[in-house]
Amino acid sequence: MLFFPKPRPPRPGALRAGLAALIMGAVVWPVIGAARPGAVPAPVPAPVPPLAVSLGDGLATRYAAARAEILAAVRTADRHGHHRRAAALRELAAPARRFLAFDGRDGGRAAEVFGDLPTARGIAVLVPGAGVDLDRYGPLRGGATRLRDALGDGSAVVAWLGYATPSSVSLQALTPARADAALPALRAFVRELRAARPAARIWLVCHSYGSVVCGRAAGGLDVAGVVLLGGPGAGVATAAALGPYAEVWAGRAAGDWVALLPHVSVELPFATVGLAADPVSPGFGARILDAGGGGHGDYLAAGSPALASVARIVAGAGDGDG
């Protein structure tokens, strides 16, 4: 009988070194097919008044205007043969859905509201990571819905798809370039929200590559705090860079593959490869929340410890494991 010894698991240092080599290989030999799919045509959206102007009786008008933009994008997508996109957009245009903004171009931009924005004492802005666009919007909406349910009355959640996310497996997901491009839009949105709701506690809840976006954008913003979930990096070196007064929390589930990524930054002539500090490392300085044992996509899953932790934090009750 032949005996095959059980292979020993690779040492963490060797695994990280190998992953670093893969990152470098991704720079030199880009993955075929990793480029973002061709943009689906969509009309240019009409300008909208500032949220502070719309927040009262005008909010329903702003929601209706965004719905009209979505329906216009449906017609354009159908006319150009993009029927999958058209079907996804029809779901977004349901009368019960409420969008502050919509732009169907370049993968799509949207800001959807869950809860009563004018009366909410606490507002969570949910910032997604790689691979999210109008065709793959469902997980973002689901997470926002569950977080709003966990927070209860007196709260609102905004699902903010306000930037061109990188593809899930791509060189773009290994550099801060997409996060830097998103920075002006996220800052402008949060400032508009703050002007409309000066007394509300506003939190950024950022998943995966969204942690890099929030890390780059949060400094100088008037927010109560930032929550980084499953972040492959924080975009900055320490939690202090996210603002002198903001609470900074981070969590990583026990089954999240992001833990295997090396946290290195390599300056090359044409790109910076790496996403800065590990958000859950002691040196970063964030408070650590209970993220449970799920995987990378499970942070806001129904019944998850991370969902309960985020709800407690945003509600101002902290987290038991912090």
Task: Give residue ranges: language-model regions.
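Lipolytic serine-hydrolase domain surface
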Residues: 130-133, 138-145, 150-188, 196-200, ...
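Short hydrophobic segments within beta-strands
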Residues: 126-127, 205, 251
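Well-ordered alpha-helical segments embedded in enzymatic catalytic cores
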Residues: 3-6, 185-189
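Structural motif
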Residues: 122-124, 201-203, 225
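Well-ordered beta-sheet/strand-loop patches within structured domains
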Residues: 186-188, 192, 208-209
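Gly/Ala-rich beta-loop-alpha elbow adjacent to hydrolase catalytic centers
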Residues: 205-215
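Flexible, membrane-associating and regulatory peripheral segments of lipid-active enzymes
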Residues: 1-139, 316-322
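Generic recognition of flexible, low-complexity loop/linker segments
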Residues: 110-114, 191, 214-216, 236-239
